[in-house]
Curated annotation (Swiss-Prot):
GO molecular function, one term: structural molecule activity
Predominant localisation class: virion
Post-translational modification: Late in virus-infected cells, may be cleaved from a 56-kDa protein to a 53-kDa protein by a cellular caspase. This cleavage might be a marker for the onset of apoptosis in infected cells or have a specific function in virus host interaction.
The keyword Ribosomal protein appears for this protein: no
Lineage summary: Viruses, Riboviria, Orthornavirae, Negarnaviricota, Polyploviricotina
Name of the protein described by the UniProt record: Nucleoprotein
């Protein structure tokens, strides 16, 4: 994008840093993941986990959730003011899985939040290290994006379930900061805004008084975040209209849904980062790797290289396919839930199957599931090639408008065409171009109609051998142009439930 000079890179957002040069960014991102690794090692010691148990992704997730809960100021305050039966506001915990006599056992643990905060700070040179917490949130969000569908949430806000490719980051907590905002998809932002407008319609005092002033500031900030994701003048102008509305109502909801639909072809810029489970960073730190000295990037070769050398295990239910479980976690690790399957498969070096064909449920195990029949297997998280993660929507011809398949938000900066069914998308735009945004709507529709599915995005960009860390020899893959590339077709995944 043209305004790149004024933007902080997403590593800077991630580490809360001011403008830094590349080396400083690599060092501060390294410091962040190194802190996560040190914390994880300390927790494994506290819990007396064996090496194998410490590499179990379910244990990693429990430990990550505990530290996120320990630092959730708002919820902690709420829990103290509204004591609920059987919930100690000062404690946090979850299931820890241990191997006993050839079987997996579940043990529910409980810790003082204060104690967890102490261990986290100690691992992070005495600082709160909010960036590391956000990093863990984004990893959980990427895992949710790969695992669950948000059809119900889309329908509730009046959007079309086929817009699922716009929903990256829809389960991120509000406190995820600038790094969180960068990875949220257009649909996620639209949904948050619609929910806000609906509350305003139903509750007369929502925009009023001292609280209402704060609400209004939050509303305008969310509008600006969404505006920044759009890459065409007309879409941005419409966002200005929505933001400046005296009292936002149904007209604004209409405009937002129109914009969300338009983003299926005129895609927004959404950042992608490879955020790995805490145990992966822990393994590397334990083996003596110094992240801060070596430097680390979330968007380059580093996460690929880390996964090449990490052995992570997962619990497997009786009729689940371990290869499918691996695919789910691989996609989550690279934030590739909405990427074209042709591209992901090429990079991974094994065919990635659409979610409707996966024989696996989510990674987390519910408390009522029977542990007797649980097995465990190694997750295959290695890749054949690596590629640079993108923050653009892959729009062609000078970043204006291009083809967007109903279900792709590119993750990797790799040349491909973006197959899309224009008829399906354009059918959603019949009629309504009157009202105060009519000229912008007309302009947006005109740009969408001129988009061609055969246009190539990320021209000349390729993947790299894992030995090519300086990215000197791009290998540009050739894809079967007609091949449909979406993960969500024929979907039968579970809904995301909080």
């Amino acid at each position: 994008m043209a305004s790149q000079g004024t933007k902080r890179s997403y590593e800077q957002m991630e580490t809360g840093g001011e403008r830094q040069n590349a080396t400083e960014i690599r060092a501060s991102v390294g410091r962040m993941v190194g802190g996560i690794g040190r914390f994880y090692i300390q927790m494994c010691t506290e819990l007396k986990l064996s090496d194998y148990e410490g590499r179990l992704i379910q244990n990693s997730i429990t430990i990550e959730r505990m530290v996120l809960s320990a630092f959730d100021e708002r919820r902690n305050k709420y829990l103290e003011e509204h004591p609920s039966a059987g919930k100690d506001p000062k404690k946090t915990g979850g299931p820890i899985y241990r191997r006993r006599d050839g079987k997996w056992m579940r043990e529910l643990i409980l810790y003082d939040k204060e104690e967890i905060r102490r261990i986290w700070r100690q691992a992070n040179n005495g600082e709160d290290a909010t960036a590391g917490l956000t990093h863990l949130m984004i990893w959980h969000s990427n895992l949710n994006d790969s695992t669950y569908q948000r059809t119900r949430a889309l329908v509730r806000t009046g959007m079309d379930p086929r817009m699922c490719s716009l929903m990256q980051g829809s389960t991120l907590p509000r406190r995820s900061g600038a790094a969180g905002a960068a990875v949220k998809g257009v649909g996620t932002m639209v949904m948050e805004l619609i929910r806000m407008i609906k509350r305003g319609i139903n509750d007369r005092n929502f925009w009023r008084g001292e609280n209402g002033r704060r609400t209004r500031i939050a509303y305008e900030r969310m509008c600006n975040i969404l505006k920044g994701k759009f890459q065409t003048a007309a879409q941005r102008a419409m966002m200005d209209q929505v933001r400046e509305s005296r009292n936002p109502g149904n007209a604004e909801i209409e405009d937002l849904i129109f914009l969300a639909r338009s983003a299926l072809i005129l895609r927004g810029s959404v950042a992608h980062k490879s955020c790995l489970p805490a145990c992966v960073y822990g393994l590397a730190v334990a083996s003596g790797y110094d992240f801060e000295r070596e430097g680390y990037s979330l968007v380059g070769i580093d996460p690929f290289r880390l996964l090449q050398n990490s052995q992570v295990f997962s619990l497997i239910r009786p009729n689940e396919n371990p290869a499918h479980k691996s695919q789910l976690v691989w996609m989550a690790c690279h934030s590739a839930a909405f990427e074209d399957l042709r591209v992901s498969s090429f990079i991974r070096g094994t065919r990635i199957v659409p979610r409707g064909q996966l024989s696996t449920r989510g990674v987390q195990i519910a408390s009522n599931e029977n542990m007797e029949t649980m097995d465990s297997s190694t997750l295959e998280l290695r890749s054949r090639y690596w590629a640079i993660r993108t923050r653009s929507g892959g729009n062609t011809n000078q970043q204006r408008a291009s083809a967007g398949q109903i279900s792709v938000q590119p993750t990797f900066s790799v040349q491909r065409n973006l197959p899309f069914e224009r008829a399906t998308i354009m059918a959603a735009f019949t009629g309504n171009t009157e009202g105060r945004t009519s000229d912008m709507r007309t302009e947006i529709i005109r740009m969408m109609e001129s988009a061609r599915p055969e246009d190539v995005s990320f021209q000349g960009r390729g993947v790299f051998e894992l030995s090519d860390e300086k990215a000197t020899n791009p290998i540009v893959p050739s894809f079967d142009m007609s091949n449909e590339g979406s993960y969500f077709f024929g979907d039968n995944a579970e809904e995301y439930e909080n």
